[in-house]
Regions:
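Acidic, glycine-rich low-complexity segments
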Residues: 11-198
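Secretory targeting and sorting signals
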Residues: 1-14
Length: 198
């Protein structure tokens, strides 16, 4: 049965259509299979990892989160949502690395910030990657991505994207600093420093 037909049948029968996820203790890995074109990974606010609202592991035990897609190229969006807390183990602030295995195409990586000060930096390596904690090491990596969206929320954020193209940087309340590559869209920002790298 085709994947799309399986989704339609699940919806008709009232079966859950959220992501399927497993935790592999031997590799400390959460594995999530996308069953819609947009998947959100976040912190429940208490150290549990949520994928589209379902508990899939804990930040204390998980070293990596792998999100895989079965959708056509260019249609996937994988979101790291930090509105309920950083996607990091609370005592050490150690982050699991998030891998978005979306295949080829112009897929989207998106980050939604915390209520405090955030520093997110997008890079053009390994397909595309985003540093979520200013340590110069990517925390969110995609195999092939056409667009990155960085959303600052409250707090004085630093959003930096040296990639040129179709990315979007959206600021929230606070005094934000933005460094955007040529061709990127910047919205809602009080202060913008275009085309400068961190």
């Amino acid at each position: 049965m085709a994947f799309g037909a399986l989704l339609a049948l699940s919806a008709a029968l009232g079966l859950p259509t959220g992501p399927t996820c497993t935790y592999d203790a031997s590799t400390a890995t959460v594995q999530a299979q996308m069953v819609s074109a947009r998947t959100v990974v976040g912190n429940a606010g208490d150290g549990r990892i949520l994928v589209d609202g379902r508990v899939c592991g804990t930040l204390a035990q998980t070293r990596q989160i792998v999100v895989a897609s079965a959708f056509p190229p260019g249609t996937d969006t994988v979101v790291v949502d930090e509105r309920h807390g950083r996607l990091a183990e609370p005592s050490s602030m150690r982050r699991p690395k998030v891998f978005a295995l979306t295949g080829t195409g112009g897929d989207t990586m998106e980050v939604i910030g915390t209520a405090g000060r955030d520093r997110y930096v997008a890079y053009n390596d390994l397909g595309a990657s985003i540093d979520l904690d200013a340590d110069r090491a990517p925390d969110f990596v995609s195999t092939d991505v056409g667009r990155i969206v960085l959303r600052g929320m409250a707090g004085d954020d630093v959003l930096s994207d040296g990639r040129s193209g179709h990315d979007r940087l959206a600021c929230g309340p606070g005094l934000d600093t933005v460094r955007a590559g040529s061709g990127n869209t910047v919205t809602g920002c009080e202060r913008s420093l275009p085309r400068r790298h961190p």
